[in-house]
């Protein structure tokens, strides 16, 4: 006899789910199906792609943080949360009759086979760099992107702005549209900063000019081999550290918040 315990939806009905020492992929599919069933969880069964979109992003970022921390236990947990999100979205589509989780897996396996002809075919690539070039060429052919502009249009607009800027710049550079070295990128950044200053003084076009400054800064980072998001993340951590030093100093010296700027400069 199966050992079953129950999930309760509203205290009115019980949904049986087999308890066992270890679960697998099929169990995840089944528990998501049960949670979204008419007898399942009141919250889960009313969710849509849009309502849990943020959850997917947050779980991906939490997995990324686990990688940064090199915490295997945390990474295992967070990858599970990401996988749960993927299965949840696929189950919504299964109910709509548009695709299933099997279709998702089938599609990604076929994509990997197609984009690795040097492994599963007769093509030859002898370096990671040549593999990336081949991957991009195959991706563009697969998606029917005949021009660099079409490839740029396909870069996800939901990406963090700095990463999107970096990807767009790389595609332009691959097409031959770029500064020859970092000096040109630095000069452009200085030019954009001057234009931002003028915009602030006139009160017109500040948002556009600020965007230009950030875009130019990303290009400098690209020439220097620096990930712009990681650079900003590091600055955020530095800001927290310095702010706490200022805050602690102000408290110890009985100073007011108005005096924190002077302490801040001392902390730098």
Question: How would you name each of these model-derived features?
Answer:
Residues 2-78, 84-210, 214-268:
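Flexible "arm" and connector segments at domain edges
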């Amino acid at each position: 006899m199966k050992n079953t315990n129950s999930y309760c939806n509203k205290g009115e009905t019980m949904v049986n789910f087999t308890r066992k020492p270890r679960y697998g992929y099929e169990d995840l599919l089944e528990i998501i199906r049960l949670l979204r069933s008419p007898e399942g969880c009141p919250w889960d069964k009313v969710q849509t792609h849009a309502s849990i979109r943020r959850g997917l992003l947050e779980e991906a970022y939490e997995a990324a943080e686990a990688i940064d921390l090199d915490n295997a236990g945390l990474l295992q947990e967070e990858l599970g949360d990401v996988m749960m999100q993927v299965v949840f979205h696929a189950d919504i589509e299964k109910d709509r009759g548009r695709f299933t989780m099997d279709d998702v897996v089938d599609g990604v396996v076929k994509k990997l086979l197609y984009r690795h002809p040097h492994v599963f075919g007769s093509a030859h690539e002898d370096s990671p760099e040549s593999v990336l070039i081949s991957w991009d060429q195959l991706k563009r052919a697969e998606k029917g992107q005949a021009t660099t502009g079409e490839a740029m249009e396909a870069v996800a607009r939901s990406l963090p702005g700095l990463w999107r800027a970096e990807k767009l710049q790389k595609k332009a550079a691959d097409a031959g549209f770029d500064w020859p070295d970092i000096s040109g990128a630095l000069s452009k950044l200085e030019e954009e900063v001057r234009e931002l200053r003028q915009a602030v003084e006139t009160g017109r076009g500040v948002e556009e000019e600020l965007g230009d400054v950030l875009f130019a800064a990303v290009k400098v980072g690209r020439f220097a081999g620096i990930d712009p998001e990681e650079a900003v993340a590091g600055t955020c951590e530095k800001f927290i550290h310095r702010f706490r030093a200022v805050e602690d100093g102000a408290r110890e010296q009985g100073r007011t918040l108005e005096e924190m700027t002077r302490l801040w400069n001392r902390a730098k």
